[in-house]
Design a protein with these regions (language model features):
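Conserved alpha-helix/loop element of class I SAM-dependent methyltransferases that forms part
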Residues: 1-10, 27-30
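Class I SAM-dependent methyltransferase "Motif I" SAM/SAH-binding loop
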Residues: 18-22
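Class I SAM-dependent methyltransferase SAM/SAH-binding core
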Residues: 23, 28-63, 70
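A short acidic, Gly/Pro-enriched loop at the edge of an enzyme's catalytic core
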Residues: 74-83
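A short SAM/SAH-binding and catalytic strip from SAM-dependent methyltransferases
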Residues: 82-100
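A short glycine-rich, Lys/Arg-flanked "PGG" loop and its adjoining helix->strand segment in the class I
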Residues: 100-115
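Conserved beta-strand signature within the Rossmann-like core of class I S-adenosyl-L-methionine
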Residues: 116-124
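Class I S-adenosyl-L-methionine
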Residues: 131-208
Length: 208
């Protein structure tokens, strides 16, 4: 399955976890001027959405996989991806109460990133009673997300309220219609082996 993908070590590889109907992946690939060197991989567990994307998308630089990204991502070699995108992941992969379940998966994602590769997370916060989300609650949640992923080795590069303006998926478009009760955040994390080594060195020096 993985071996059938035609990208080389010099290729730029972009992966979307849970691509849905593939509209975002397709748009990113179409806007990419490096069709012969950049390769896009979409992973979707829902067979109906996967088949819809497979019928519609015919770009040579896109490969689609039907299955759980939790099972598929570990199959790829380490230091393979330039960018991994997760758009509004299922609560099983981002909810505070389920951190023990999903933290190990994102550590795998980290290992699959090339040095200086990045992981873009777009997720949302809602209230159980569907009340508006206050700034205090929102910023506390964003800080928790940021520090949680940094504890795994990721480096926080950028954070921006909402989803990127040029991103469109069924859920993103729906959530944009209710920004007070559904508050999204886009966090972009990086992987820098040298920076992490320097941080480890400084920590050990401080302990001495």
């Amino acid at each position: 399955m993985i071996k059938s993908f035609s990208f080389s070590k010099s290729s730029k590889v972009i992966v979307e976890l849970g691509m849905g109907d593939g509209r975002l992946l397709e748009k990113l690939a179409k806007c990419d001027g490096n069709i012969h060197s950049d390769y896009y991989i979409g992973i979707e567990i829902d067979k109906q959405q996967y088949e819809e994307a497979n019928r519609r998308i015919n770009l040579v630089n896109i490969g689609l996989l039907n299955g759980s990204f939790e099972d598929i991502v570990p199959i790829f070699p380490d230091d393979c991806f330039d960018l991994v995108i997760a758009v509004l992941p299922d609560p099983d992969f981002i909810d505070i109460l389920k951190r023990q379940k999903w933290e190990s998966f994102y550590k795998v994602v980290y290992s699959k990133l090339k040095n200086h590769g990045s992981f873009q997370l777009i997720t949302e916060l809602t209230d159980e009673l569907l009340q508006p989300i206050s700034n205090k609650v929102y910023y506390k949640w964003v800080e928790w997300l940021s520090t949680t992923f940094q504890s795994m080795g990721f480096i926080l590069l950028t954070k921006e309220e909402g989803a990127p303006l040029d991103y469109s998926t069924r859920c993103i478009d729906q959530f944009r219609g209710d920004p007070e009760r559904i508050r999204m955040i886009t966090l972009t994390f990086g992987k820098s082996i040298m920076m992490n080594l320097n941080q480890d060195w400084l920590t050990s020096e401080h302990q001495l």
